[in-house]
Amino acid sequence: MTFNELTKLLEVEGFEETAAELHGIICGRLAGGERLHGDKLRNALLASLHSEEELIDNALPSLSRLYQQSLAGLTDPGFAFKPLLPGEETPLAERVEAMAQWTQGFLDGLADSGLSGETLFSDDAANALGDIAAIAQAGFDGDGENEDEVDFAELEEYLRVAAILIFSELASPDDIGPATSTTLH
């Protein structure tokens, strides 16, 4: 599901959450160790979202696909995961706002999963969590020049890697899959 597809779904259904925020919530819950299927996903969404139960029920098939897409991205051995954000055709100020919404959603999802800062195993993951919290406060006061675009791209890449790091720190071996080894003969 693309950012634009999710945005349209949420607008049609009348959700209070933005596409970036909702994807962040789902990824945060995943990073916090939750694996949600069927009614567990529905109940988690009811607990995390401000939107009405009927809206969530109407959109549940699409939200289930988004959940599966997010889990697949976070567990991909090629590190294919990306936060769901608007594309380059969107003005930079709106992309920065969406990034702040995604990071706040991610933090909310982590909190809803029961994760606390003490749960993280490494200093790197704890630092990444602190950086994500700082990005959640991001604003835009630039003029949209190339330098601003480069800064945004670097933040987006950092956010992608930080989310993968936190997820992998807390993931079970079943989430990551069997380790591959290379043997020299």
PLM segments and residue spans:
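Domain-length accessory/inserted modules outside core catalytic folds
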Residues: 1-103, 107-185
